[in-house]
């Protein structure tokens, strides 16, 4: 191995290290590769040190096997890059840190640290790992060629402090974004020079570095000498680490508010958040000002949704000054776990439309699959972005805390070279955790199609064709061609194996497929597509919860696993499986159904029945107020639930599954449901309104109208002062009521009570066609309330509780904008009138009540499981803590 020791001039020139000590570097490694005409792709440089596990010197010293770095280099020099000289291409790969071997590797680390990926005995001075046996999947091949790597080591970076800082981040996966290019060169025997540069970072926003790396690669390839090329790498590494990204990392780490922003697709609200003079942005993210600096003194500016870091403190030694004028930009809205620039309609929707039928066909007998996606026409950047898009909608890439199915994450490999096939086989064979797991692998080589033992489904993007692996013994395809050709392994690769493109039964259709086809035909933007997928996830989750209540539930059921098995939609959004969000969705659904039941002209209720319904509505609203009063995070989670909830009047037949759903039209159902909803709410249809698509109607925000709808039941003419509000100002009385409304027994009755949907003879939710006419519910309910003082007092209490709930939401910067945008004019007027009546007169008591409500919910800190048994245990703990808090408060009084 060639080893270049940096002279003292590098240490003297690297004065940035004194100013920027890299406590937590933005970029952990910068590496380069090139294509050697004799050796193929090779690693050329690694900085600031060789990556653990990819140390060329140690491998050659042991056994001459250098395929580990060769496989890494093959990812950096992708196939066919020489076909487009002067046009850069991008690949993405991840290195996972193995705490047991203290090395990085290309495949995820097994849960059991005793099983890793290297058959070689490690000879290290560290007694904790000496003589440990591990299997290296990347090092599976016998490679006899020598590989040469220049390991750049800066003495100052090798100090103990830097080593400690490096160890602190070593346990995180490193995301590498790699830029490769080809430059024609007549002096080269190949006629061209192929080189690449990659940076490894623990940040999932690694695509933000793309533009800078592209420019640096151009300078690197034009460097007149090898020394100048290495200096460019050093300068780039120091420049990217000369800024402090704490601010954007903090903004992205606020998951609850990010989920709300992700669910907002109205540009006027986004503009309000980021550009309004009231500084909503400052309130949300606790930003002191729009003209600020990082801790190193670099200027940080804000532009629309972007935060821009300027390299104002860095002094380049080799890089040209113009490069420093390009700011590093990050979107403050973290729309996906991995930020990418991709067209979901072009690739992802077509994939879902083709793949979901195969999942439905497999049914519950297949709990795992391995998927290979191949394209020779897409650029590697588009291919990687496609695979990462699929990773985003399954939320299982790299260090994501959520699992996809039964506690296991999916293996996501954005781009895999053919040289890694044996490594993949070894990984699957040696990893017991992989049994029952999922894999999504991107390739640009059709040979993968014939490797039957590594895939269950193969998708040819270029041809738009899916292949299903039907071989009973995938590792031994018995083909006629094999008999004729013989056992030659090279020729055997091209045998046509047992796979098929069998058509899927058209009757196996779910709601997702109907939406996929409609989205493709109408060509909506990515925000609308993601909104539809999220709304569908919530809608089907709500129906699944209803179904689970009607049958016996296993004690250790995982709701997310049940959802994946039941709907087979591929995509999933874990934030909706949070207990608080689930409970919010359920309460919204119960409130929606109660209101519909009260205003339904097809049913006649006695005064007692109406009072019972009103009591249930009051319990629901009180429960919601108690929940959002706990913390700002709870408000944000509730707002996110509201933004993604669809009332069952819009799509009541969404709970149909299988054959039934194929016989109705999504468009006609949604349009009829929208008209019924407006009629029920008393909202007049605008004769001059713009005709919108069914998708736009489906993704409209209805929840805030549902919350405020009851306020219209108490007419202004009644004008009665509400005597009950006086008692609410007394601390003990209010606390007692809150505690009673949130007792475990009442909560379980509320949660397990069947939905109050009007059921048909078959027990299914009745469709829109069964209701030929929807009338304004206010005109039906208001006379009933005025006819009974008892009911009117009960209704007044509900109005007061609703007003407090809406006011609590309005106090949040985002909640204020959402209510202003999505509350219909008539309902907004009713809310403002109610707020003037209650809040302005009882401002002090409201604030006191809010504080008490927050303190009364002491169980907010209790972690709750998505399992049924775990959820019940968590609720019991909450109830016990609430009763304890109540007793303590009463003693103090």
Curated annotation (Swiss-Prot):
One of its GO terms (cellular component) is cell cortex. The keyword Ion transport does not apply. Residues 152-172, 872-892 form a coiled coil. Keywords: Coiled coil, Cytoplasm. Disulfide bonds: none annotated. Residues 494-640 form the dDENN domain. Residues 365-492 form the cDENN domain. The keyword Cytoplasm applies. It is found in: Cytoplasm, Perinuclear region; Cytoplasm, Cell cortex. Residues 841-893 are annotated as: Disordered. GO terms for biological process: actin cortical patch localization; cellular bud site selection. Residues 845-861 have a biased composition (Low complexity). Induction: Mainly expressed in dividing cells, but not in stationary phase cells (at protein level). Residues 28-335 form the uDENN domain. Residues 863-893 have a biased composition (Polar residues). Residues 25-488 are annotated as: Interaction with active ARF3. Interacts with ARF3 (in GTP-bound form). Interacts with CNM67. Involved in actin patch polarization. Required for maintaining a proper budding pattern in yeast cells. Required for proper polarized localization of the ADP-ribosylation factor ARF3 at the plasma membrane. Belongs to the AFI1/mesA family. Present with 768 molecules/cell in log phase SD medium. This is ARF3-interacting protein 1. It comes from Saccharomyces cerevisiae (strain ATCC 204508 / S288c).
């Amino acid at each position: 191995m060639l080893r270049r020791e940096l002279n003292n001039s590098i240490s003297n020139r690297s004065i940035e290290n004194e100013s920027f000590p890299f406590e937590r570097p933005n970029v952990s490694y910068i590496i380069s590769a090139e294509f050697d005409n004799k050796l193929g792709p090779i690693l050329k440089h690694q900085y600031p040190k060789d990556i653990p596990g990819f140390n060329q010197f140690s491998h050659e010293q042991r056994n001459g096997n250098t395929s580990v770095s060769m496989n890494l280099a093959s990812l950096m020099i992708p196939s066919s890059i020489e076909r487009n000289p002067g046009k850069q291409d991008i690949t993405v790969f991840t290195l996972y840190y193995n705490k047991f071997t203290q090395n990085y590797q290309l495949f995820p680390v097994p849960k059991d640290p005793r099983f890793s990926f290297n058959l070689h005995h490690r000879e290290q001075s560290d007694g904790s790992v000496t003589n440990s046996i591990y299997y290296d999947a990347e090092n599976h091949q016998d490679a006899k060629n020598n590989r040469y790597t220049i390991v750049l080591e800066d003495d100052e970076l090798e100090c103990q402090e830097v080593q400690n800082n490096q160890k602190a981040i070593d346990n995180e996966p490193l995301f590498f974004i790699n830029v490769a290019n080809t430059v024609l060169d007549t002096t080269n025997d190949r006629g061209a020079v192929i080189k690449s540069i990659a940076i490894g970072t623990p940040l999932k926003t690694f695509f933000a570095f793309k533009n800078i790396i592209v420019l640096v690669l151009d300078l690197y390839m034009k460097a007149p000498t090898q020394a100048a090329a290495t200096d460019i790498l050093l300068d780039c590494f120091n420049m990217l680490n000369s800024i402090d990204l704490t601010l954007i990392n903090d903004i992205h780490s606020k998951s609850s508010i990010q989920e709300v922003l992700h669910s907002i697709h109205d540009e006027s609200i986004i503009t309000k958040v980021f550009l309004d003079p009231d500084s909503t942005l400052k309130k949300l993210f606790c930003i002191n000002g729009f003209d600020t600096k990082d801790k190193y003194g670099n200027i940080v500016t804000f532009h629309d949704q972007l935060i821009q870091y300027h390299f104002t403190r860095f002094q380049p030694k080799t890089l040209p000054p113009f490069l420093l004028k390009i700011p590093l930009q990050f979107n403050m809205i973290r729309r996906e776990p991995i930020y990418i620039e991709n067209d979901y309609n072009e690739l992802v929707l077509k994939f879902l439309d083709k793949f979901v039928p195969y999942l439905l066909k497999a049914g519950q007998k297949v709990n795992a699959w391995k998927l290979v996606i191949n394209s020779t026409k897409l650029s590697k950047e588009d291919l990687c972005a496609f695979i990462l898009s699929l990773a985003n909608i399954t939320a299982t890439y790299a260090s994501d805390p959520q699992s996809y199915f039964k506690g296991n994450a999916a293996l996501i490999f954005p781009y895999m070279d053919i040289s890694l096939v044996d490594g993949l086989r070894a990984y699957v064979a040696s990893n017991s955790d992989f049994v029952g797991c999922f894999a999504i692998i991107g390739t640009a080589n059709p040979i993968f199609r014939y490797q039957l033992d590594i895939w269950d489904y193969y998708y040819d993007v270029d041809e738009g064709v899916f292949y299903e692996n039907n071989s009973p013994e995938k590792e031994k395809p018995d083909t006629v061609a094999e008999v004729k050709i013989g056992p030659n392994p090279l020729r055997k690769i091209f045998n046509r194996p047992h796979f098929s493109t069998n058509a899927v039964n058209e009757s196996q259709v779910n709601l997702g497929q109907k939406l996929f086809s409609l989205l493709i035909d109408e060509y909506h933007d990515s925000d609308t597509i993601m909104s539809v997928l999220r709304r569908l996830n919530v809608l089907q989750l709500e129906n699944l919860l209803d179904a689970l209540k009607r049958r016996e539930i296993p004690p250790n059921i995982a709701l997310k696993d049940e959802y994946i098995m039941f709907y087979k939609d591929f995509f999933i959004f874990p934030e909706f499986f949070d207990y608080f969000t689930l409970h919010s969705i359920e309460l919204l659904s119960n409130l929606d159904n109660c209101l519909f039941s009260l205003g339904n002209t097809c049913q006649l209720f006695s005064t007692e029945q109406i009072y019972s319904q009103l009591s249930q509505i009051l319990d629901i609203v009180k429960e919601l107020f108690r929940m959002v009063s706990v913390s700002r995070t709870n408000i944000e989670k509730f707002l996110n639930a509201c933004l993604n909830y669809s009332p069952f009047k819009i799509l009541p037949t969404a709970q149909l599954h299988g054959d039934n759903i194929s016989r109705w039209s999504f468009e006609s159902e949604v349009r009829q449901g929208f008209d019924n909803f407006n009629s029920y709410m008393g909202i007049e249809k605008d004769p001059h309104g713009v005709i919108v698509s069914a998708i736009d109607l489906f993704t409209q925000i209805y929840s805030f109208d549902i919350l405020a709808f009851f306020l219209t039941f108490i007419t202004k003419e009644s004008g009665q002062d509400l005597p009950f509000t006086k008692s609410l100002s007394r601390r003990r009385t209010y606390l007692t009521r809150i505690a009673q409304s949130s007792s475990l027994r009442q909560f379980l009755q509320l949660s397990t009570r069947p939905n109050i949907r009007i059921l048909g003879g078959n027990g299914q939710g009745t469709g829109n066609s069964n209701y030929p006419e929807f009338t304004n519910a206010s005109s039906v309910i208001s006379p009933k309330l005025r006819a009974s003082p008892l009911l009117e007092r009960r209704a007044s209490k509900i109005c007061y509780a609703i007003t407090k709930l809406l006011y609590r939401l309005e106090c949040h910067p985002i909640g204020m904008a959402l209510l202003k945008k999505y509350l219909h004019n008539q309902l907004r007027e009713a809310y403002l009138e109610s707020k003037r009546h209650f809040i302005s007169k009882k401002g002090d008591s409201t604030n006191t009540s809010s504080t008490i409500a927050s303190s009364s919910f002491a169980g907010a800190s209790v972690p709750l499981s998505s399992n049924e048994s775990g959820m019940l245990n968590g609720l019991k703990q909450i109830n016990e803590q609430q009763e304890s808090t109540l007793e303590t408060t009463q003693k103090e009084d």
